[in-house]
Amino acid sequence: MVSTPSNRTSDRPVRRRTRTFRPNYLSFAGTYQCNLTCPHCCVPIEWPERLEIPSALRFLEGAHRYGIRILGFTGGEPFLYPEFLIALCRRGAELGYRFDKIVTNGVWFQDRGHLETVLKGLTKAGFSGKLGLSVDKFHGVHTAALADFCISARQIFARDNIVSLSYASRRPDQGLEPIYALAKDLNAVVDWSELLHRYLLVSPELTITLNWNHLAPVERAEKLSGAWDGRWFQEDYCEGPGQALIVNPRGEVKPCCGFASDLDQLTIGNIYQDSVAAIVRRARKHPYVGKIFRQGLSAIRDEILARDPAAFPGATSNHCFFCWHVLTRGLAAGVSGGGGQVGNWTGARPNFTGELIQIGIKGKA
């Protein structure tokens, strides 16, 4: 198997490597809604909430004052709420944020004119990051539309590296078939880069980096087998997907962008009522979140196994699946169980001690 970084590898600059929660990345999901219903998706796309633009702008400015300098966007499908993207990008550019990427399925547009209008709005707003295109078997076959997206983005942004690709699979050398199909439409080749330790899609007009995501069978994908693969995850203190403030459409703030992040147990604040400093303090004191960034996910695993050696059906190399399993099943100390599809997206249930714990985070009234 080819060794490649996944979304757990971060190239974000870190001022100091103190083992604590010290976010250096801000990401907004303006809407849960999406034009696709992917079978592996962990986002509750049924929920109608949208982030209010003035409140998001205030939080963006507060994060900048706190010292956070990198900005990204996710969803749902973020391009279904283009006015949010453009307003936040414009203010982010004015403040001097470094843009990461806008994660998109790339097939949200009605026609080429609609696509070009929205992308031109982004360029005028000052967006200088990447368009992170999700291309894998779970998103369905939309090769022609994806090719249109890549070509239009290249022309409008005048950058050969404007697009990056993400794909979810069990292993980095699996699940590449839709990408090979896209490469054919773009007159491109897909090959391994020894320098970057990942695949590249390259054409005369485009240079696209491929990012592998370790598929976590959670939420809608819980029925997929193979999560307990017999190997324990390598400890990384969640430095890649974590050390972030991820704001969902309800205004709730999460400490990571992992597959388990929409669970209520990982809420560390709300932008409608909390400052950035207050959210960071709460995360550090949080009985689960704080421990992950201080001691690692392996410390939570070891604590559970010391209490019950038969607590898990096996070992898993997938960090996000392990986190989701522990939280929904109520195996972790200090937080309740429930949530996700196990709890029909809402609600809580007692943890292993029989306690139903309220961490103290309330949503917008």
Where are these regions (language model features)?
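N-terminal [4Fe-4S]-dependent radical SAM core
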Residues: 1-27, 230-231
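Canonical Radical SAM [4Fe-4S] cluster-binding loop centered on the CxxxCxxC motif
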Residues: 17-53, 66
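Radical SAM/AdoMet-radical enzyme domain recognition
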Residues: 26, 53-73, 81-192
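Residues immediately within or flanking Cys/His clusters that coordinate Zn2+
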Residues: 31, 35, 235, 317-320
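Active-site-proximal cofactor/substrate-binding loop regions of enzyme domains
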Residues: 36-40, 44, 77-80, 101-102
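Cys/His-rich zinc-coordinating "finger/knuckle" motifs
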Residues: 41, 45-48, 245, 263, ...
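A C-terminal junction/extension of Radical SAM enzymes
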Residues: 161-259, 297-317
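Flexible mid-to-C-terminal extensions adjoining Fe-S/redox cofactors in radical SAM and related proteins
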Residues: 258-365
